[in-house]
Curated annotation (Swiss-Prot):
Record lineage: Eukaryota, Viridiplantae, Streptophyta, Embryophyta, Tracheophyta
Glycosylation sites: 87, 99, 146, 193, 323, 436, 473, 515
Family annotation (Pfam families): Methyltransf_29
BP terms from Gene Ontology: methylation
Name recorded for this polypeptide: Probable methyltransferase PMT6
Keyword Transmembrane helix: yes
Enzyme class (EC, first level): transferase
Length: 591
């Protein structure tokens, strides 16, 4: 077991761990402040340090659930990158039962309750508070993502380079090693017949498949284009961890056997640059998932060898892609350099004709209405049925009432009231957190409802992952219609992200929703543990909920090594105030 021990006693197999507050702000007026932890390396050395009683012990989830008086146990240091539902060791045990030809091994596989870890995930050795945005777009601390594989195999394509104590991201990629900005301009020209850019082509929201370190998304931001970037946890180890450390919206995911956790008709563009997806296989079922996600007149951008190479099996793959896209009534609008671009023309008559010719099957209406959470991929094509034009800019989308909300009974007055409420609350949040706005970049709203919190945060230099629990009504379609991004998720399970991802996690009545309703894996302590895993050291957790839940969390927070304050803020009815918890994760380490 690595780590020094404070105190001389050892009891049985329990080893006491030194947990030290890393005091002082990383930024003291300059980019690279002190950011140095205070280590205790000898039992008699207690100066300027804080000792905790938490024990280092590999602990699994058990019933009844009991948190020791000494506080939550701390997982051993080797679990510093633990992702419960993407655990390579557990997935390896499942391999005989998985469809490897369709890469089911890359999807989420959450362990049963008794195999879940129930201990705090520690930071790695020499972890530092992340560099602030926008500098983090180009530089992150090497010790925070201490993996060299990508730099070794992708350095020549300008993904990432090592520079002393930093990782440097030049903005390149496999198909844009000379820079994402030039590549993005080229795509805009291809979409507009050399007359405009992605904005004039109507692109506001993008899904980047197999995103690498997310440089493509980073360079779309100046255009006001919002991107969800995803990639699996595969041989390109830690690519999503790099993206999130940079402050770019990303998550772990894979196109394999299940629908992606996003609503239908959510994106104007789906992008694949050497994304390692075999779109041409299995009767194009993966392309049909792209069709589901694209809005009418949305674009599929494909930068990959079959689009330009004439050797090996690439011409055969290209012919299959052409046949599959034609059957879905897509139109190939440009093919040059190393990229092909299709447009999804929403021609209902065409789709019905293709169905009559047995070239495709059309999805049932109820398939369109289901939340996309653990839903098997459908070998059918959805007709979106959309008739209303979306505003052309992000600013307009943020304020316009989404028509999809009317379908689920949310009126325009309720929408306006929610927007005003969260604008006021976000102002209070910043005042009470009392930090520079650049200290918060990655934000998650665990129960986003219709996106009012994220819309209010839009004036700050942050991005927000809006989560709509899969057990609630599908309001995520309305969130996407507002120009915001998000995903479906079930908080009985861990989220598909690395530890230490978010600077701020916002929870509005998440605990009361899951309280005693969804099984033992969704207890208050389970959700708190997942919050702790995904929030960064010195990051914030803001919790609004029923008073009895607030009281319980207030009592448990110190055992999770959270500082906690209670503030009274106006509730949604604006008739009374409610207690809101402001928790801050301490910066501690195993020594």
């Amino acid at each position: 077991m690595r780590g020094s021990v404070i105190g001389a006693e050892r009891s049985g197999q329990t080893i006491m761990v030194a947990l030290v507050l890393m005091v002082g702000s990383f930024y003291t007026g300059s980019l690279f402040g002190t950011n140095q932890p205070i280590y205790v390396s000898h039992p008699s050395s207690h100066s300027a340090s804080s000792k905790f009683a938490n024990k280092i012990e590999l602990t699994y989830r058990r019933l009844p659930l009991v948190i020791p008086e000494s506080g939550m146990n701390v997982c051993p240091l080797e679990f510093n990158e633990y992702i419960p539902c993407h655990n390579v060791t557990y997935v390896h045990q499942l391999l005989p039962s998985l469809n490897l030809s369709r890469r089911e091994d890359l999807e989420r596989h959450c362990p049963p309750l008794e195999h879940r870890l129930f201990c705090l995930v520690p930071p790695p050795n020499d972890y530092k508070i992340p560099i602030r945005w926008p500098t983090s777009r180009d530089y992150v601390w090497r010790s925070n993502v201490n993996h060299t594989h990508l730099a070794q195999v992708k350095g020549g394509q300008n993904w990432v380079h090592e520079q002393g104590q930093f990782w440097w991201f030049p903005g390149g990629g496999t198909h844009f090693k000379h820079g994402a900005a030039e590549y993005i301009q080229r795509l805009g020209n291809m979409m507009t017949n050399e007359t405009g850019d992605l904005r004039s082509a109507g692109v506001v929201q993008v899904l980047d498949v197999g995103c690498g370190v997310a440089s493509f998304a980073a360079y779309l931001l100046p255009l006001g284009i919002q991107t969800i970037s995803f990639a699996p946890k595969d041989g390109h180890e830690n690519q999503i961890q790099f993206a999130l450390e940079r402050g770019i919206g990303a998550m772990i995911s894979a196109v394999a056997t299940k629908q992606l956790p996003y609503p239908a008709a959510s994106f104007e563009m789906v992008h694949c640059s050497r994304c390692r997806v075999d779109w041409h296989t299995n009767d194009g079922i993966l392309l049909k998932e792209v069709h589901r996600l694209l809005r009418p007149n949305g674009f599929f951008v494909y930068s990959s060898p079959p689009a330009y190479r004439k050797d090996k099996e690439y011409p055969m793959i290209w012919d299959k892609l052409v046949n599959l896209t034609s059957a879905m009534c897509w139109k190939l609008i440009s093919r040059k350099v190393q990229t092909a671009i299709w447009i999804k023309e929403e021609k209902e008559v065409c789709l019905k004709q293709k169905a009559e010719l047995k070239l495709i099957s059309l999805c049932d209406v109820e398939d369109v209405l289901k939340p996309s959470w653990k839903v098997p991929l459908k070998d059918c094509v959805q007709i979106s049925g959309q008739t209303e034009e979306r505003p052309s800019s992000l600013a307009e989308r943020l304020s316009a009432y989404p028509a999809t909300l009317r379908k689920i009974g949310i009126s325009e007055d309720e929408y306006t009231s929610d927007t005003v409420f969260w604008r006021e609350q976000v102002n209070h949040y910043w005042r009470l957190m009392n930090v520079n706005e650049t200290e918060v970049r990655n934000v998650m709203d665990m129960n986003a409802f219709i996106g009012g919190f994220a819309a209010a945060m839009n004036s700050y230099p942050v991005w927000v992952m809006n989560i709509v629990p899969a057990t609630m009504n599908d309001t995520l379609s309305g969130i996407f219609e507002r120009g915001l991004n998000g995903a479906f998720h079930d908080w009985c399970e861990a989220f598909s992200t690395y530890p230490r991802t978010y600077d701020l996690v916002h929870s509005d009545h998440v605990f009361s929703h899951y309280n005693k309703s969804y099984g033992d894996g969704c207890l208050l302590e389970d959700i708190m543990l997942e919050m702790d895993r995904i929030v960064r050291p010195q990051g914030f957790v803001i919790i609004r909920d029923e008073e009895y839940i607030i009281s319980r969390i207030r009592g448990l927070a110190p055992k999770f090594l959270w500082e906690v304050e209670t503030h009274e803020l106006e509730n949604k009815d604006k008739k009374i105030t409610e207690s809101v918890l402001f928790c801050r994760k301490r910066f501690w380490a195993i020594i």
